[in-house]
Amino acid sequence: ENVIYINKAQTAELYPTLAHEGYPGHLYQNVYYAARNDDPVRYLLDYPGYSEGYATYVEGFSYSMMDAEGYGDIYQQMNMEMYEYNLALCSRVDLGVHYEGWKKKDVRAYLRSFGMNDSQADELFQMIIENPANYLSYYIGYQEFHELLTDYKKNGRE
């Protein structure tokens, strides 16, 4: 049985979260994949850039499906751009910490220039320390799916 549990305390992002975790995101992706009966070795391997990239792409795409109640395309575009911005910013901090050796003070200083306070910076720093390259799997995977669609459209296939 496929179940998605909803945190009723945080419903502001419910629509894109359901797109990411449910349909057309991970739920669709996993049910489709399981039905293919692929080589068993593929079930042993983990491809977070592929799985999270796909779910992140469809989550972002969900913003274009929202009923913006009179705000139209501007509202949808703003949400999508803010979503990409946040992924890019967190990915940049991840690279700073794990590749360039940033310390907590460096993350705080960097994020202050984007309007984030120290407690927000500390929370992001802790998540990045605990899960290296996690944001990169979402963001780079998302970019790969975006590029795939762009190439597909460029070659006249729609």
Model-derived features: positions:
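Long, His/Glu/Asp-enriched segments that create or flank divalent metal/ion-associated functional microenvironments
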Residues: 1-158
